[in-house]
Amino acid sequence: MQKITLILVLFFTMNLTAQNTTNMNIYDFSVSALEGGTIDFNDYKGKKMLIVNTASKCGYTAQYKQLEELQKEMGDKVVVVGFPANNFGGQEPGSNEEIATFCEKNYGVSFPMAAKVSVKGADQHELFKWLTAAENEDFTGDIKWNFEKFLIDEEGNLVHRYRSGASPLDEAILSALED
């Protein structure tokens, strides 16, 4: 009898957890900011967001310039949020302070940057667990490299995922941001 009770408890717990994850959106998260404080995604309600995992020593690092351009051009309706991560080839080895200095000095980054996180593996940040979860079936799966982009709509829902090779100024991304 105890085994049956335990199995039922586990089943209902897992079912509730799955339902909660499915109903989540970006407004359920906040993250530590690169230069201290917190990035609360509730502050961006009503705007689209482009969430990007970044790195300072990657072949795609020049996308910082395009991301900054995008933020300046569309900042009234779009927020770019960068997430430095050292998951791919050790291409983000710096401290938060070093990353902030690099971004400002080389690209004039003014969009919000989160503190360094892990975007995959056992220590994957909760936000990236949600972004890559099976509930987001069209976008599921591990991040493959730096500068993958996740488009969030004005209601906080994940609506598209773009791989590293997609320029932030790619026509498909710009069109999705303008819709």
Regions found by a protein language model. Name each.
Residues 49-52, 79-82, 112-115, 151, ...:
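Structural recognition of the beta-strand scaffold that forms the well-ordered cores
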Residues 19-42, 126:
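N-terminal "domain-start" segment that seeds a small globular fold
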Residues 77-95, 110-121:
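Thiol-based oxidoreductase modules, predominantly thioredoxin-like and allied folds used
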Residues 47-48, 57, 61-86, 103-107:
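Conserved helix-turn-beta segment immediately C-terminal to the redox Cys motif
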Residues 97-146:
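Short, internal strand/loop/helix patches
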Residues 1-24:
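Bacterial Sec-dependent N-terminal signal peptides
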Residues 126-129, 133-179:
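Thiol-/selenol-based redox modules, centered on thioredoxin-like
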